[in-house]
């Protein structure tokens, strides 16, 4: 299992939408924003497959009644893996986690290190040639 420390950058507070089929979110889980009124906590849902998440779950779980922490996706952000990856693999959202992207799917970020299902690793930017 990958062991990494995470520096909390830009952590925000969020609750799960009442329509969520899960009871809480985990660290590095991809999340989609449902609403943000600018005056309180953000409301989120687990991200659908093959979509680009707005946030990832932080170290404090988001629940329907209790706000937890979320982070924007940035280099170094914690991401939860749903399968085996190697450093530099492009990642997509599938089954509520990040997995190695398949042809024709939306890659969100790259893996900053090797890891397996259930590991929390750091996100890395996708290299682009200008």
Identify the meaning behind each predicted range.
Residues 1-130:
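Surface-exposed, low-hydrophobicity beta-strand/loop segments enriched in small/polar/acidic residues
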